[in-house]
Amino acid sequence: MSFRFNKGAFEDNSFNEQIREALTSALNSKTQSSSQTAPANTTNSAATDEVKQETRGPKRLDILKSGISVSKVNFPSTPQLEILDLDVSAQSRSLLKGICKVSCKNAMLEINTEIEANLLLLYTNDGPSFTTPRLISNDSFTVPITMTFNQIELEAITNIFVKNNSVGISFNDVNLDFDFDCSIKLLQSSIEKRLKGSMETVFKEVLPSVIFSMSQRWFTHGESTCNSASDDKSAGRQVENHSHTPRTILEDCDLEDLSPANMLRLSTLVSSRQSLSLNPTAMNTLSTIPGCLERQNLHRFNSRIPALSNFYPDFYEVESPHLKAFGRSVSTNVISSGKLEHHNALPQRVLDERSYDLKTIASVQSRIFERSSGDGTAIRRRKIKMGKKSKSKKAQSQDIENSSPTVVMPSSPSLEPSAVSTPEALHSPQPTTAVQSPELLAENSESVSIPALILPTQADHYTLPVKTSAPKLNLLEEAHYLNRKREFQKLRTSLYSPIRSNRFNLNKEMERPILEHKGLNFVGLTHGLNWGSEDLPPPYRG
């Protein structure tokens, strides 16, 4: 079953005017209610206003400077209504329930209003006077705005309730599409997003109230409606006035059942919000707000930082008198000279009296390392063994004798140099025989004593001198030393010369100097060869 609307009613401008007035009153219903309650609020006391402001949530700023007015409404095509279901038997005769499908196309709507562009003015008007600054120029700046909705297409499934003199409607499934245009292009995208998000409230509250108010004009006429409307307004005003009258939540007898500690904390919080003071309500705590540090408790925080100076606060003699009056101690970093020392340092008095403890120092250092690293790495300490007895000189000499090999020095025959009478004899060669006669050997054997064979156990022990490690030379000193060694190496000595065995014990040819045939320049060449490879150059030497 379906119905058709009368086309003459939509062709006439009266229907559009009725829709325009109904939409204007519905959109301005909230602003009118707030303006009516404003004079009632001024009569209340200041205490009740503060309690209400504290109990309410955060207040939203209203940027509307004036009311919302619907300037144009146009329905070029007749809306269509299709009844999907109708229930009459189960209900009384005065109630009609049905499910309908409503469709509307090519509708147009234009809305005008004014907004406040100076948001700082809104914040200062709503905020308390003792927290708002005094601005030199804080005037109002009103901007008019016009919003136009074109090509509105609506398809919805609705539940309709008809009872005596009114029609109630609720929207279930809604498909809405429109073209939006705003006079301020900068705000068009943001307003369009907000409108699409607020369409749910439009179809739940605005349109049902508009249809309900228009249905009362369709079904009934006369003074009864005016009287009922006036009665409703008077009843509404009485309810509003009653809602703003102060009410007693707790009586004096009820205060005895409350905890005194809780009441003290509540009163402290209320006073802190009014005076912006941060007096702590708990004892032995750094701050009442977790994660925040108050200025008055900064000395407690500094005293709990792991440092050697915090373990010996009594050894600092200087304290400021103005802090002593409040029962506080000055920071441990301040000394008598007025300069700042390191945070991790012992006082001089502790070092003089030797009143420190190694375990305490180790624990402090480990805590500092754990706080600084934060990655859970193990602490690596340097271990020093104290009280270990050193070996005596006799024990060292015995160890050297046991480790060094034994050497037997054979007795060399005494060689007497032949006397040279004249210089001619020195330069004139004398013939000698390679093989001597047996008689000469016999004579020489009597004069020369052959040493007896000595076993290792019977031989006298000769200890070799301990070789000391030569000092480390740098590149320039090593090159100079090798050049000097080469000059001594060129000497032709005898095979059995003791000079070669003792002073020049060379088994292989010396290495060539490092700096030979290399074009390198060093700063040390002009400074007497006094710095090595591990030291800094002379300009940077400390």
From Swiss-Prot:
Top-level taxon of origin: Eukaryota
Keywords assigned: Lipid transport, Lipid-binding, Membrane, Mitochondrion, Mitochondrion outer membrane, Transmembrane, Transmembrane beta strand, Transport
Subcellular locations according to the entry: Mitochondrion outer membrane
Family: Belongs to the MDM34 family.
Membrane topology category: Multi-pass membrane protein
Bias kind Basic residues: ranges: 379-394
Disordered: annotated span: 27-58, 372-435
Protein source organism: Lachancea thermotolerans (strain ATCC 56472 / CBS 6340 / NRRL Y-8284)
Free-text note on domains in this protein's UniProt record: Lacks alpha-helical transmembrane segments, suggesting that it resides in the membrane via beta-sheet conformations similar to those predicted for other outer membrane proteins and porin. The SMP-LTD domain is a barrel-like domain that can bind various types of glycerophospholipids in its interior and mediate their transfer between two adjacent bilayers.
The name this protein goes by in its record: Mitochondrial distribution and morphology protein 34
Residue ranges that the Swiss-Prot or TrEMBL entry lists as coiled coil: none
Residue stretches making up the SMP-LTD domain: 1-216
GO MF entries: lipid binding
